[in-house]
Amino acid sequence: MTNLVRWLFSTNHKDIGTLYFIFGAIAGVMGTCFSVLIRMELARPGDQILGGNHQLYNVLITAHAFLMIFFMVMPAMIGGFGNWFVPILIGAPDMAFPRLNNISFWLLPPSLLLLLSSALVEVGSGTGWTVYPPLSGITSHSGGAVDLAIFSLHLSGVSSILGSINFITTIFNMRGPGMTMHRLPLFVWSVLVTAFLLLLSLPVLAGAITMLLTDRNFNTTFFDPAGGGDPILYQHLFWFFGHPEVYILILPGFGIISHIVSTFSGKPVFGYLGMVYAMISIGVLGFLVWAHHMFTVGLDVDTRAYFTAATMIIAVPTGIKIFSWIATMWGGSIQYKTPMLFAVGFIFLFTVGGLTGIVLANSGLDIALHDTYYVVAHFHYVLSMGAVFALFAGFYYWVGKIFGRTYPETLGQIHFWITFFGVNLTFFPMHFLGLSGMPRRIPDYPDAYAGWNALSSFGSYISVVGICCFFVVVTITLSSGKNKRCAPSPWAVEENSTTLEWMVQSPPAFHTFGELPAIKETKS
């Protein structure tokens, strides 16, 4: 009973962070299963495993996206690493609103349940994660599936908004003595910017899907031209949320990578303030570029010119971050432990994804490439090899601090190389498919595309082996005995550590700080 009470009613940021990690792992495995089903269907031309049920294919695509974005990356990055380490890094005893933190987590399992139900009732929700009307309207999806998906999004949105309020309050009001804003670790800054993005963008999504809900069930016509509505309005509202959302997914990763690169290069991050302002700029600019997802809907040519230019401007702060990471490594004594491998892999592959993003920013080119596999390749490079690599990097970096046990280094490196090989083999060929005009969200294709698709599917099977490796690492780490105890600061002598989490024992006490730490100076 005591255990049940501890985990169900927890107000401790570490316990809630651990719950987020477990939840993210479960959702991640489910999302991966769906992606493998997608790749099995696309492994060769013709109908493969879904027996010609093309609606089911789109249900898989939709569920894969929602699971990975709202139930894997966001809970693990913001809920997991954010909850665990933001209070420790700023020298706070806990989050500002511990019970709000608890409800933020417990809104997610019901939300996940609603999403899974949506896939199981009637013919499921085969709309893609964008849920565009009229396809998501009552005439095209007549059952309750889309409505369930909408309620699922509402719940996970409320969870994220409450969480972001909590993070903003915590970071502004609960820093320890001497911890000025300009001394905040970069991961804390990244979570702060992310929280503001969530707070400003999610209500817009909530408005859009609520209007969709009333269009479907109460005969309103927000998105129906027959009653004076406009489906393009939905696209504007959705992408005004959807574009900041992709920065929400990657920004905490930026913070994690900054810490890791600094630690394993043995020197402070190059250009700390530049890094902070780059993140803030990315956050601000993220709200000014949404229509680049809509170049094909007949926007005015001047509008397209603006959104092309604005999108390219985002590459500037992003480039500042990448070159600062490289400058941090420059001349350092680099140790290629597993976290650093994932961090370097992140920098390399995120850069590739960013470059294809610059290609797609050109409205003229995008009209040819829109809704092809080129776009799929682009965002999977920044998510599947950006966000996910950052998650793995953060896991290996902090796992000793979280569980108080060291992970098997060799197996971690094997996990990295298998995953690195698998994801590249999966997504690199998609650039070629897109350039040849293979459209997204279609379960069958002409024979000409067979070769690259077969390669891509093979790559996804390798990625699954990598994920199995990862869970073996987790199992070994959790079941290792007292001889595998983790030092307070496993990566450096405590005197050389630049952030607070390495000053406390591994794992930290239930109440981290007996008295709040005072910060005298920081090495940067």
UniProtKB/Swiss-Prot annotation:
The coenzyme or cofactor needed here is:
heme; Cu cation
**Where does the record say this protein resides?**
Mitochondrion inner membrane
Keyword list (alphabetical) reads: Calcium, Copper, Electron transport, Heme, Iron, Magnesium, Membrane, Metal-binding, Mitochondrion, Mitochondrion inner membrane, Respiratory chain, Translocase, Transmembrane, Transmembrane helix, Transport
Under Enzyme Commission nomenclature, its number is 7.1.1.9
Catalyzed reactions per annotation: 4 Fe(II)-[cytochrome c] + O2 + 8 H(+)(in) = 4 Fe(III)-[cytochrome c] + 2 H2O + 4 H(+)(out)
Binding positions (O2):
247
> Is the keyword Lyase assigned to this protein?
no
Concerning InterPro entries, the annotation shows:
Cyt_c_oxase-like_su1_dom, Cyt_c_oxase-like_su1_sf, Cyt_C_Oxase_1, Cyt_c_Oxase_su1_BS, Cyt_c_oxase_su1_dom, Cyt_c_oxidase_su1_bac
**Gene Ontology cellular component terms for the protein in this record:** mitochondrial inner membrane; respiratory chain complex IV
Instruction: Provide any one GO MF term from the record.
Output: metal ion binding
Q: Binding residues for Mg(2+), per the UniProt record?
A: 370-371
Check the record and name the SUPFAM superfamilies matching this protein.
Cytochrome c oxidase subunit I-like
Q: One Pfam family for this entry, by name?
A: COX1
Q: Which residues make up the binding site for heme a3?
A: 378
Asked whether the keyword Heme is assigned, the reply is yes
The residues that hold Fe(II)-heme a are 64, 380
Recorded superkingdom: Eukaryota
Q: What does the record list as GO biological process?
A: electron transport coupled proton transport; mitochondrial electron transport, cytochrome c to oxygen
Relate the assembly described in the record. Component of the cytochrome c oxidase (complex IV, CIV), a multisubunit enzyme composed of a catalytic core of 3 subunits and several supernumerary subunits. The complex exists as a monomer or a dimer and forms supercomplexes (SCs) in the inner mitochondrial membrane with ubiquinol-cytochrome c oxidoreductase (cytochrome b-c1 complex, complex III, CIII).
NCBIfam families per the UniProt record, alphabetical: CtaD_CoxA
Which family does the record assign? Belongs to the heme-copper respiratory oxidase family.
Role, per record: Component of the cytochrome c oxidase, the last enzyme in the mitochondrial electron transport chain which drives oxidative phosphorylation. The respiratory chain contains 3 multisubunit complexes succinate dehydrogenase (complex II, CII), ubiquinol-cytochrome c oxidoreductase (cytochrome b-c1 complex, complex III, CIII) and cytochrome c oxidase (complex IV, CIV), that cooperate to transfer electrons derived from NADH and succinate to molecular oxygen, creating an electrochemical gradient over the inner membrane that drives transmembrane transport and the ATP synthase.
Classification via PANTHER family? CYTOCHROME C OXIDASE SUBUNIT 1
Q: What's this protein's name?
A: Cytochrome c oxidase subunit 1
